[in-house]
Amino acid sequence: MPNYDKQFYDDIRETSRHAARTIVPMVLELIGPVASVIDIGCGNGIWLSVFREHGAERTFGLDGGHVDRATLEIAEGDFKAADLGQPLPIAGRHDLAMTLEVVEHLPKARAESIVDDLVSLAPIVLFSAAVPGQGGEGHVNEEWQDTWAERFERRGYRTLDPIRPKIWHDPSISWWYQQNLLLFASPEALAGNPDLARVADQTDRARLSVVHPRIFVARHKFLVQINRKRINLVKELAELQAKYDALSRSNDPTEN
């Protein structure tokens, strides 16, 4: 995991809070109220604090030892430092488990076992992970959404895509949530919630792996700029080569 510092968390604090306050009510409208939530890679706990605003009585977060306890937005006793690259040192069951833009920082060898951890923790998982080419500090395993869905589905969980369509066109929400945010639900969760089961039935499994236009356009502009610089450098190099060749000929006595 990268060593994120206080400045990193300060920079993302309010954008994360806004996203959480927009998305959490959507999640709860679908799955119903939750008493307990666990966040794997919780950072300073902003998402957990928003779940508490919406009635969660018990929240717990895990992240690396780099997290400054002074920045936590949950009680320090609700946070545990852990190496997320290893099987999680926790047990117990919660109403909801979540991990948002975290698993891309873990080695590919950890991909299967992190899903094992998540399904052991809750019947419903809120999940977001970087796709190939997304880029970011410390990303070592970017995979498509349907690859992660297959992992959950092998463990009996179904894939739900109810949130992305609701936030897709909202420019105030960070594009990585617009692009990557999915829910996974166990048979027990679906059996007790007809609305949840209906969303699972309606989810278009073939359209999970997508790239948001905001990042596509940004990457395209960047590549155009790089290509322009390349063209200019090639032109300058050709001009320098021509000057060098001319100078070499002028100093070559055999040319006189």
Where are these regions (language model features)?
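Conserved N-terminal segment of class I S-adenosyl-L-methionine
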Residues: M1-M98, A109-L121, G135, H139-R151, ...
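Hydrophobic adenine-recognition pocket in adenosine-nucleotide-binding enzymes
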Residues: V102
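A short His-aromatic
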Residues: H105-L106
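Conserved beta-strand signature within the Rossmann-like core of class I S-adenosyl-L-methionine
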Residues: A122-P132
